[in-house]
């Protein structure tokens, strides 16, 4: 068991830069970086230390409580291969599937024939359907807080690779190609983050 598992869980306080300024605080970029990493670490530790399904579900759905914009202010500018950057990408992925489950399913289904091994790693139903895809991304995020975090990241990476392949196949054009490439890049970052977590170096 790593040092991460021994630390006492703390409830993260989600004070974005704009919220801090609204309460009279001065904006400090260095402090913002510190807050980003501390909140990400606290969120993961709270879920993993609690070992409580109810806590896990609240953390999976935290965007529903505080809004994606709050997480964006906290985490979106952090490196992709950092804990806050990694969590940001996972929550964005979940939010996209929640907002466009039919599109996500169509692109995922189209990508399976190009990336069969990734489909197996992601663990989606076959054939995929919108409800199943939505459950899948929740299950992946749930693994961050109550399972093997590195495996959760590898599943998210595999899911992203399948969607990337499907999007490139069924949506020709430079914009879709760029989006597909971005998804592929995110998959590489998630895979790298999984390796870092296993090495105790994802902060």
Regions flagged by a language model, labelled:
Residues 1-87, 91-95:
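N-terminal domain-start signal
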Residues 14-17, 21, 34-37, 93-119, ...:
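Long, highly charged low-complexity segments enriched in Glu/Asp and Lys/Arg with interspersed Ser/Thr
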Residues 31, 65, 69, 76-135:
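Long, charge-patterned amphipathic interaction tracts in eukaryotic proteins
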Residues 33-44, 56, 60, 72, ...:
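Generic detector of well-ordered alpha-helical segments enriched in charged/polar residues
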Residues 53, 57, 80, 124-127, ...:
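Short, solvent-exposed segments of well-ordered alpha helices
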Residues 70, 101-108, 141-144, 148-152, ...:
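Long, hydrophobic, amphipathic alpha-helical segments used as structural scaffolds
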Residues 113-175:
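Conserved binding-pocket/active-site segment within a compact domain
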Residues 161-203:
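Glycine-rich, aromatic-bearing surface loops/beta-hairpins
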């Amino acid at each position: 068991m790593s040092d991460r598992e021994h630390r006492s869980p703390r409830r993260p306080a989600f004070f974005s830069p704009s919220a801090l300024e609204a309460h009279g605080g001065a904006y400090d970029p260095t402090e913002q970086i510190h807050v980003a990493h501390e909140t990400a670490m606290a969120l993961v530790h709270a879920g993993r230390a609690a070992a409580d399904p109810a806590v896990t579900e609240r953390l999976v759905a935290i965007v529903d409580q505080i809004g994606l914009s709050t997480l964006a202010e906290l985490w979106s500018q952090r490196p992709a291969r950092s804990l806050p950057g990694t969590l940001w990408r996972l929550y964005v992925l979940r939010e996209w599937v929640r907002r466009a489950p039919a599109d996500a399913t169509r692109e995922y289904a189209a990508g399976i024939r190009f990336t069969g091994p990734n489909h197996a790693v992601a663990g989606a139903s076959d054939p995929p359907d919108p409800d199943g895809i939505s459950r899948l991304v929740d299950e992946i995020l749930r693994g961050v807080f109550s399972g093997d975090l590195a495996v959760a990241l590898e599943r998210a990476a595999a899911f992203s690779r399948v969607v990337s392949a499907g999007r490139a196949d069924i949506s020709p054009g430079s914009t879709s190609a760029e989006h597909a490439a971005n998804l592929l890049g995110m998959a590489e970052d998630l895979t790298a983050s999984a390796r870092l977590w296993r090495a105790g170096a994802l902060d």
